[in-house]
Swiss-Prot record:
InterPro entries: DNA-dir_RNA_pol_insert, DNA-dir_RNA_pol_RpoA/D/Rpb3, RBP11-like, RNApol_insert_sf. It comes from Chlorella vulgaris (Green alga). SUPFAM superfamilies: Insert subdomain of RNA polymerase alpha subunit (SSF56553), RBP11-like subunits of RNA polymerase (SSF55257). Belongs to the RNA polymerase alpha chain family. Its EC number is 2.7.7.6. It catalyses: RNA(n) + a ribonucleoside 5'-triphosphate = RNA(n+1) + diphosphate. DNA-dependent RNA polymerase catalyzes the transcription of DNA into RNA using the four ribonucleoside triphosphates as substrates. This is DNA-directed RNA polymerase subunit alpha. GO terms for cellular component: chloroplast; DNA-directed RNA polymerase complex; mitochondrion. GO terms for biological process: DNA-templated transcription.
Length: 278
């Protein structure tokens, strides 16, 4: 429990659920009337969209040129295989005191039928571990062969959304005129940075016909709920009951710390800009 005067962030309950997913319930406060709603909406969005994690960016399956292809002697379609691959969960295999900032590598799988293919059959780099080995990938009949390779990346919000942005416009910095008014630059189209994630994906799609593209943003937090409760009816103070479900690659306590840090950094930057402009 972290407590500063009348502020608190307490983990009330935590448990492991089915298929390795993690659940935790927190009490966060104290807020004045109306502040809890603002805080709850902000931290929920940060938890769902700004968490670091592994993701498969694209997959190559031998014999498949598109998502709707059917492989011989394989019960699942290519689309079903891709959806099953997305259920696999990866974590870095490093000491706890060591930071894991970036990673880009690949994994592969090659199995012959008959039999079932699971996530445990995937071959990975030494620094990556699959924590969902029981996830079903495909069912092979006699004579079937499943061979695939995928690109694996570790990404976080700071890498995906750098402050300079994916689109860069030279006119934005000059939008403020000498008299302090802001010019309307909506008719000027920004230029696309060649090193941006979106630009790289467009280039990859043009250069490869057998690449099957998957996610571009990691989502280790699967679900977030919050309820606002009254703490003291006399002074109108409130607190939040926050529930978090993750896929097992990230502890709910860690996700709360990440979200609070990201929100603090974001608002702090705008506070500095406001000071400089005055």
């Amino acid at each position: 429990m972290m407590k500063t005067h009348n502020l608190f962030v307490s983990c009330i309950e935590s448990r492991v659920q089915d298929q390795g997913s993690l659940y935790a319930r927190f009490h966060i406060g104290t807020f004045f009337r109306g502040q809890a709603l603002t805080f709850g909406n902000s931290i929920r969005r940060a938890l769902l969209s700004e968490m670091p994690g592994f993701l498969m960016t694209d997959v190559r399956i031998q014999g498949a040129t598109h998502e709707f292809a059917v492989l011989p002697d394989v019960e699942e379609t290519v689309l079903e295989i891709l959806l099953n691959l997305k259920k696999t969960v990866f974590v870095p295999r490093i000491p706890k005191n060591q930071k894991f900032e970036t990673f880009q590598g690949f994994g592969f799988l090659k199995n012959n039928g008959p039999g079932k293919v699971r996530a445990a059959d995937i071959r990975l780099p030494e620094t990556v571990q699959c924590v969902s080995p029981e996830v079903h990938i495909a069912t092979l009949t006699s004579g079937a062969e499943l061979s695939l390779r995928f690109n694996l990346q570790f990404r976080n919000f700071s890498q995906l959304e750098k402050r300079e942005g994916t689109f860069k416009s030279k006119t934005v910095a000059q939008a403020k005129t000498e008299d302090g008014n802001v010019q309307d630059t909506t008719n000027e189209l920004p230029t696309l940075e060649k090193n941006s994630l979106f630009f790289q994906q467009l280039q990859n799609k043009r250069n490869s016909k057998d690449q099957l593209f998957l996610d571009t943003v990691p989502m280790p937090v699967q679900k977030v709920n919050y309820v606002i409760k009254s703490l003291n009816a006399k002074n109108g103070s409130e607190y939040i009951i926050l529930e978090i479900w993750t896929d097992g690659s990230l502890y709910p306590q860690e996700s709360v710390e990440f979200a609070l840090r990201n929100l603090t950094d974001l608002f702090f930057q705008f506070a500095n800009i406001s000071k400089k402009s005055n």
